[in-house]
Amino acid sequence: MAKKPRVTKLNTDRRSRANERERQRVSEMNGMFDVLLNLLPPSHFKTRLSRVQILREATSYIIRLHNFLIESSNSDIDAITVFPHIFNGERKSNKDAIRRPMKLKQGGGVAAFISRHELPPLQLPNPVIPILKPTSVPVWPQTNVYIAYF
């Protein structure tokens, strides 16, 4: 007859620490998938994407960007028409771009800086200058939003 392993305080402490490490690992992975999802163009999906779907979408997006870079060197294809979400600030955000930095383990981290300020200036082929009528509504300056995950 096999002996039952005795449950000791040492074993329960080890198990508790291992469980806490696993919870932390899963939390970090979920945070990294959220960062990746927010870097993708707006999606037609109505429900939350699974991890596999996020990876497939990211792979497809990287391939499209790569193909665009190859094709654009030989033609006059405009990045603004192919990838308008990058230049127009139409990124999908679950929390309206209000996020807290992730707390990752020391030595590891994810950083994502998304700002229209860092993109090249928007230049249309034939700029149209509209004639504006004076209004009494004050116009506030636009501010850039920086999202950082560490």
UniProtKB/Swiss-Prot annotation:
Natural source organism: Caenorhabditis elegans
Knockout or disruption consequences: RNAi-mediated knockdown reduces expression of alpha integrin ina-1 and ADAMTS protease gon-1, and causes defects in migration of the gonadal distal tip cells (DTCs).
Function: Transcription factor which binds the E box motif 5'-GCAGGTG-3'. Involved in migration of the gonadal leader cells; distal tip cells (DTCs) in hermaphrodites, and linker cells in males. Positively regulates expression of alpha integrin ina-1 and ADAMTS protease gon-1.
Source lineage: Eukaryota, Metazoa, Ecdysozoa, Nematoda, Chromadorea
Domain bHLH: 13-65
Recorded name of the encoding gene: hlh-12
Name of protein: Helix-loop-helix protein hlh-12
GO biological process, one term: gonad morphogenesis
Quaternary data: Forms a heterodimer with helix-loop-helix protein hlh-2.
MF (Gene Ontology): DNA-binding transcription factor activity, RNA polymerase II-specific; protein dimerization activity; RNA polymerase II transcription regulatory region sequence-specific DNA binding
